[in-house]
């Protein structure tokens, strides 16, 4: 099974992440940031990953350190759980609507970290989470997991719906891209 555990402890955060890529969508999430808990729970469910994220962070400052470090820890868990990536599909692109919002997320599990994040939000906060931190989460995930990730919010009005469509599309793209579909490395170079 493709499982990995990460413990990340800094002066700003203490984080535990456990990820089972081949899980059933079970989530145990407690980040101290309610809206992020909601998004990570959706990510686990729609990606069919078993995901545990426990974070104690300096949210009295703001949410940035916790959000970024959670992205780092989940990215590290994803990269290591995949191992040598033998047999994975590698590529995926998914469109997901959430009411009036539509997002497209494309991924290449390539060992080449790159983020394109085309999404704008009208509000500064959703609950206790800064909308600026969503890009920071995905940047941290990309840099640590070493994937190429394109996030395109095509349209939408409600920021909650916009972000939810992004996270659901991200989850489905991760799931599809990491599916085992052969016994070969999906690269003409022979390595990912």
Swiss-Prot record:
Keyword Lyase in annotation: yes
Keywords assigned: Amino-acid biosynthesis, Cytoplasm, Histidine biosynthesis, Lyase
Reaction(s) catalysed (UniProt annotation): D-erythro-1-(imidazol-4-yl)glycerol 3-phosphate = 3-(imidazol-4-yl)-2-oxopropyl phosphate + H2O
Subcellular location(s) per record: Cytoplasm
Top-level taxon of the source organism: Bacteria
GO molecular function: imidazoleglycerol-phosphate dehydratase activity
Coiled-coil blocks: none
The protein's Enzyme Commission number: 4.2.1.19
Cellular-component GO terms for this entry: cytoplasm
Keyword presence, Amino-acid biosynthesis: yes
Gene3D superfamilies assigned: Imidazole glycerol phosphate dehydratase, domain 1
GO process annotations (BP): L-histidine biosynthetic process
Pathway membership: Amino-acid biosynthesis; L-histidine biosynthesis; L-histidine from 5-phospho-alpha-D-ribose 1-diphosphate: step 6/9
PANTHER family membership: IMIDAZOLEGLYCEROL-PHOSPHATE DEHYDRATASE, IMIDAZOLEGLYCEROL-PHOSPHATE DEHYDRATASE HIS7
Record family assignment: Belongs to the imidazoleglycerol-phosphate dehydratase family.
Identification of the protein by name: Imidazoleglycerol-phosphate dehydratase
Organism lineage string: Bacteria, Bacillati, Bacillota, Clostridia, Peptostreptococcales
